[in-house]
Design a protein with these regions (language model features):
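Active-site- and interface-proximal helix/loop "cap" or "latch" segments in soluble metabolic
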Residues: 21-116
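Beta1/beta-strand and adjacent pyrophosphate-binding region of the FAD-binding site
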Residues: 118-137, 153
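Glycine-rich FAD pyrophosphate-binding loop
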Residues: 147-167
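Conserved N-terminal/central alpha/beta ligand/cofactor-binding core
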Residues: 160-268, 274, 389, 396, ...
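Helical element adjacent to the flavin cofactor pocket in flavoenzyme catalytic cores
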Residues: 248-303, 341, 347
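A glycine-rich dinucleotide-binding beta-alpha-beta segment and adjacent secondary-structure elements
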Residues: 277, 481, 492-577
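Glycine-rich loop(s) and the adjacent beta-strand/alpha-helix scaffold that form part
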Residues: 293-296, 300-367, 586, 595
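An anion/pyrophosphate-binding glycine-rich loop and adjacent beta-alpha core
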Residues: 341, 350-488
C-alpha cells in the first residue's frame, strides 16, 4: 500500500512539473514597469508575453515584439538587448528570470549562449560617402546627398532608424520656415545667432554656428517634403520669439517618412551595423570597418565618412571621466556610446573639450530606484519647482530658481555637477501642490513667465501617494522633525540649512544665493519630506573639433581628409552649459546635416 502511495505521489509531482504553468513578473523599463507572463512546461519556456507597459513604440516596441520569441527559441535569458532598446530588453529579461525562479527552477540553467552566425565572416563594400548614424544630422545629410545623385550608404547601430533621438524628441528650433510664415511669425538667423552666441560666450565656433543656423530652415522644409507634418510651438522658455517646431506626425511614424524619402532618392541603409574603426591610409580616412548584428565584419571603402552617432549618453566611462562617478539616467538613445569620439581620436582628431555638457530633463528629477525618470510620479516633478534643494551633505549649493526657470540648461548643469541633489518640503507644500498647483500656490507670479507657460493649472493630485511610493522604493524619506529627516540620507548639515532657509523666507530675502523671493516657501509644518534625485539627460554635448564647414580637425587644427562630423558629435557647434533656446540641439543637428552634405559634395567635386 505504501509503495502505491509513494508511486502516486511521485507521479503527481512529475505531472505537476510537466504541466504548463503561467508565471507573472515585472521588470523596470525605460518608462516604468513592464508586466510579463511566462509559460513554463516541463522545465521548458513555451511562451513569453509582454503585457501592460508604458514603453515607447520605438525603440521599446521593437524589443517587445522581437525578444519574447528569441527567448523561447533559444531557451535562454543570456541574450543581447535588442539594439536600441536596452532598458526595455533588460526589463523583459529580468522579468523572465524572476518567473523562472518563481517556478522553482535555476536561472543559470537558462543562460546558454548561441554563437552568432556571421562570426569570422569578413565582407567588403563600397560607397562614395558613408554616414555613421541615422539620426537628425545623419539623415539630413543622407537625403541631401542622395537627392544630388551621390552614392550614399548609411549604417545605423540600431535595429531601426527610429532609435535615434532626432525622431523621438519634441522638435527643432529653426529660422525662416514656411511653418512660421503661415502663422505670421518672424524668426531670423540674426535673432537666433545673437542669442546662441551670447549663451556660448563665443566658446562655440561663430562661423560654424552662423552657417548651421542658416540651414535650420532648410532642414525643416526638407522634412516637410518627406511628408512629415509640423507646427509651431509656443515660446515656453521666454526666448522672445517662436523658433521651436513640433510634429503633428506621431513619433512612431516619423522614421518611416524619412527612410522612404532616402531610399527613393537612391540611398542605401544598413541597420544593425555599428561603426567600429575608421580605415586610414597616409593620414586620410578612406572608409570604415563595421560590425553587423550577426557578428560579421564589414569593411566599407569610401571617399568620405560622416560621423553622426549622437554623442555618448550610453557610455558611463565618458560620463565619469568628465563628471565623476555619478549616475545620469538616460532619457534618450543609449546606443550613443561615444563611437565618433573614440574613432575620431584613433584617427588623430582633436576633442572640443569646452563643449562637454548635457541636455538636462526639464520635467523633473530622476532616480534609478524609481525607474529613472517617471512622468507619472509627481515626486520627481518637484525637483524642478524651485524649492529648497540640497547636496548630500544637506547644504544648499545654488540658486534654485534656475531649476524652475532654466532646467534644460543652467539649472541642469548645476545639479549635474552636484551628482545627487535633494528636495526638502513640508506638509503644507505637499498639500498645496496636490490641491491647487505650484503656480497658484506661489500667487500666480507675473514675473515667472516660464511658470505661466509650463506650470499654470498643473495640479499634482496624486503627490501624496507618489511620495509614499517613493519612500517605499527608497528614494524619499518622511519624518516628524528635520533632525529625524536628516538621518534618512545622512545629511548632517540639513537642520542648520533649514533653519537659515526659514529665516530667509521670513525676511523675504535670500542672503545666501539671492533667489527670487516668490520661491522662498518656508519648511515649518511636519511631517517633512526629502526626495533624492539623480541627474537625467536627453542627450550629451561635446565631441570632435571641426572647422566652420564640419571637416574634423587634427591637433594641428588641420582637416583630416575624408572625415566629417554632424549633430552633437560636432563639438565645435555646441557649448557648456547647453543653449537656452528650446530645441536648439536637434535644430542645429538637422542644420549641420545639410551643411555637412554640401561640404562633402563640394570636396568630392574638387
Amino acid at each position: 500500500m505504501k509503495q502505491w502511495i509513494c508511486l502516486i505521489l511521485a507521479l503527481s509531482m512529475l505531472l505537476a512539473c510537466a504541466s504548463a504553468e503561467v508565471y507573472e513578473a515585472a521588470g523596470t523599463g525605460k518608462n516604468g514597469d513592464i508586466k510579463v507572463s511566462v509559460t513554463i512546461e516541463g522545465g521548458k519556456i513555451t511562451d513569453v508575453s509582454v503585457g501592460e507597459n508604458t514603453e515607447d513604440a520605438i525603440p521599446g516596441g521593437v524589443a517587445i515584439e522581437q525578444l519574447p520569441g528569441i527567448i523561447v527559441e533559444r531557451q535562454s535569458i543570456a541574450l543581447d538587448a535588442v539594439t536600441g532598446a536596452t532598458l526595455t530588453s533588460n526589463a523583459i529579461l529580468s522579468a523572465v528570470e524572476q518567473a523562472i525562479k518563481d517556478a522553482g527552477l535555476n536561472p543559470d540553467d537558462y543562460r546558454a549562449t548561441v554563437a552568432k552566425a556571421g562570426e569570422g565572416v569578413v565582407e567588403e563594400e563600397h560607397a562614395k560617402v558613408v554616414i555613421v548614424g541615422a539620426g537628425a544630422g545623419g539623415m539630413m545629410a543622407a537625403i541631401t546627398l542622395a537627392r544630388r545623385g551621390v552614392d550614399v550608404l548609411v549604417i545605423e547601430k540600431g535595429a531601426t532608424i527610429g532609435v535615434a533621438n532626432g525622431w523621438n524628441c519634441g522638435g527643432p528650433m529653426a529660422s525662416n520656415t514656411s511653418v512660421q510664415a503661415a502663422e505670421g511669425v518672424k524668426v531670423t538667423d540674426e535673432m537666433l545667432f545673437n542669442d546662441l552666441t551670447e549663451d556660448a560666450y563665443l566658446t562655440s565656433d561663430s562661423r560654424l554656428l552662423r552657417r548651421v543656423i542658416a540651414k535650420t530652415g532648410e532642414a525643416v522644409e526638407l522634412q516637410i517634403s518627406t511628408g512629415l507634418e509640423m507646427y509651431l510651438r509656443p515660446d515656453n522658455y521666454g526666448a522672445g520669439y517662436r523658433s521651436r517646431h513640433g510634429y503633428n506626425t506621431a513619433k512612431a511614424d516619423r522614421p518611416a517618412f524619412i527612410e522612404k524619402a532616402y531610399l527613393e532618392a537612391g540611398g542605401r541603409l544598413l541597420c544593425g551595423t555599428a561603426g567600429e574603426t575608421l580605415l586610414t591610409e597616409g593620414g586620410k580616412v578612406v572608409g570604415i570597418q563595421a560590425k553587423r548584428e550577426d557578428g560579421s565584419t564589414l569593411n566599407i571603402r569610401a571617399d568620405a565618412v560622416l560621423l553622426a552617432t549622437g554623442g555618448y549618453l550610453g557610455n558611463q566611462d565618458i560620463v565619469h571621466e568628465h563628471w565623476g562617478n555619478i549616475t545620469v539616467n538616460a532619457l534618450g538613445n543609449t546606443l550613443s556610446t561615444g563611437d565618433a569620439i573614440r574613432m575620431g581620436q584613433e584617427a588623430g582628431a582633436l576633442l572640443e573639450e569646452s563643449s562637454f555638457a548635457m541636455i538636462s530633463n526639464e520635467f523633473g528629477g530622476s532616480n534609478r530606484k524609481g525607474g529613472g525618470w517617471q512622468r507619472s510620479n509627481g515626486a520627481m516633478t518637484i525637483g524642478i519647482y524651485g524649492g529648497m534643494l540640497v547636496d548630500p551633505n544637506g547644504e544648499r549649493f545654488f540658486n534654485e530658481y534656475y531649476m524652475a526657470n532654466q532646467p534644460l540648461s543652467v539649472g541642469g548643469e548645476a545639479v549635474l555637477r552636484a551628482g545627487k541633489f535633494y528636495a526638502v518640503v513640508d506638509q503644507i507644500y505637499v498639500d498645496a501642490i496636490a490641491s491647487e498647483g505650484l503656480f497658484e500656490f506661489l500667487g500666480a507670479p507675473e514675473d515667472w513667465y516660464v511658470g505661466s507657460m509650463t506650470a499654470k493649472g498643473v495640479v499634482l493630485e496624486n503627490l501624496q501617494e507618489d511620495l509614499d511610493k517613493a519612500i517605499e522604493q527608497g528614494w524619499a524619506g518622511k519624518a516628524d522633525s528635520i533632525e529625524e529627516l536628516a538621518e534618512v540620507f545622512g545629511m548632517p548639515e540639513l537642520p542648520h540649512t533649514v533653519e537659515m532657509y526659514n529665516a530667509y523666507c521670513e525676511a523675504g530675502h535670500d542672503e545666501e544665493y539671492f533667489k527670487n523671493p516668490t520661491f522662498l516657501t518656508p519648511i515649518t509644518k511636519g511631517p517633512f519630506y526629502v526626495v533624492e534625485y539623480e541627474p537625467s539627460a536627453w542627450s550629451t554635448l561635446g565631441g570632435l573639433r571641426t572647422d566652420s564647414r564640419l571637416r574634423v580637425l587634427n591637433a594641428d587644427l588641420m582637416p583630416i581628409s575624408g572625415l566629417y562630423a554632424a549633430g552633437v558629435d560636432a563639438g565645435s557647434l555646441y557649448c557648456q552649459p547647453y543653449y537656452q533656446v528650446e530645441g536648439t540641439a536637434v535644430g542645429l543637428a538637422f542644420g549641420s546635416g545639410i551643411l555637412a552634405a554640401e561640404t562633402i559634395a563640394s570636396d568630392l567635386a574638387d
